[in-house]
Amino acid sequence: MSRGRGAASGTKYRMTLGLPVQAIMNCADNSGAKNLYIVSVFGTGARLNRLPAASCGDMVLATVKKGKPDLRKKIMPAIVVRQRKAWRRKDGVYLYFEDNAGVIVNPKGEMKGSAITGPVAKECADLWPRIASNAGTVV
């Protein structure tokens, strides 16, 4: 059910993994980064020839490809808040967003920015309280 993570609270059900390593997602906070490039995914096992992939609520290691020069060329943790790939919730609803997006955090799960643009998945908000408090809308 749950995959290993830092300061996340509660359990996370299995979701369709929509963001493999090397995916680029928008940065949904006001930290100054425009997009994030996924380098690795926390808590994934290994299988020959399978790329580690993330879904909403997963912590990833990412780099900034476009944004403030002081953020670029560093590897930092980020949390995926939206994904384009549809997934099924336990109540039978299929859900997807119009973009892939994440927010930059520290290893404890505290956000670098102070606001999130756009909606945040409920799976992510349930897991990360600091993200839930900064989210405008939770879907």
From Swiss-Prot:
SUPFAM superfamilies attached to this UniProt entry: Ribosomal protein L14
Alphabetically ordered keywords of this record: Cytoplasm, Nucleus, Ribonucleoprotein, Ribosomal protein
Any Gene Ontology CC annotation: cytosolic large ribosomal subunit
Example of a GO MF term: structural constituent of ribosome
InterPro entries: Ribosomal_uL14, Ribosomal_uL14_CS, Ribosomal_uL14_sf
Cell compartments where the protein resides: Cytoplasm; Nucleus
Protein name: Large ribosomal subunit protein uL14A
Organism the protein comes from: Schizosaccharomyces pombe (strain 972 / ATCC 24843)
Gene name of the encoded protein: rpl2301
